Amino acid sequence: MFYIFQNKKTAPRWYIIAGLFFFVHYNISHLKSGFAEISGSVEKLGWREIQFVDKKSNRFSKCGQGCIQVDSDSAVSMIQRSLKIDITEKKFLSWEWKLAVPPAPSDLARKGKDDRPLAVYITFPFDYQNASMSERAMRPLLEFSYGSEAPGRVLSYVWASAESKGKVIESPFGGTQHKMIVKRNNRSRLGVWLEEKVDILADYKDVFGGEPKSVSHILISSDTDDTLSFNTGFVKNMQFTPH
């Protein structure tokens, strides 16, 4: 069993994360250099925050044992951790999360409308054998700019607005390399902990094809800047397990 909120500080190079967010959210020109300072208690758990130019950032803080709180007020930013998880041995990821208020109306498939109050992201190392021609063509430039450890594909589990549970959506920023799976929406219960357990290996096969061998990063985000809305979200007890 691998617990995400273990008390281990990590500090990966910023250009790896820059490459990651090229896929995950904004164009690379919007990324601020380096890591932002976040709540010391969260930082001690090994998380780093990524901010974006001209965008207000969220506030991340510890909210108990193995719990992260994110307050988002017309803002967007993410916290991330580097991981080395053998996905063939520990293919399940479980966590609990909750929201304070309903998500503002948004559209995950449209740039500038794709807010989501809470999301969990998983990234995977680049896999040349199963990469598309466009991914292979782009790879040398990414590695030249951000290093060989820049991730290949991104899978995110999203608390959406009106999208149906289970719907798979291609990121308007990451394209075919970033797929979003809706887990909760504006009809989900508020103010109570809701449990999730996902088979990352099966989900990857369904949306990308092929089999990843490992996970390289995990992230938590909140995005309310397009809708100029406010929300408070919580995520706790994240862990990878074989069953």
Regions found by a protein language model. Name each.
Residues 9-20:
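Positively charged N-terminal leader segments that act as targeting/secretion signals
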Residues 1-9:
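N-terminal secretory signal peptides that target proteins for export/translocation
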Residues 43-65:
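Extracellular glycan-recognition surfaces and repeat-rich motifs
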Residues 59-77:
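Short carbohydrate-recognition loop motifs
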Residues 115, 125-174:
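Extracellular/luminal beta-rich ligand-recognition
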Residues 118-120, 175-186, 190-228:
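Extracellular beta-strand ligand-recognition surfaces/modules
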Residues 218, 238-240:
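Extracellular beta-strand elements of beta-rich domains used
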Residues 82-93, 187-190:
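Extracellular/lumenal carbohydrate-interaction signature centered on repeated Trp-anchored short motifs
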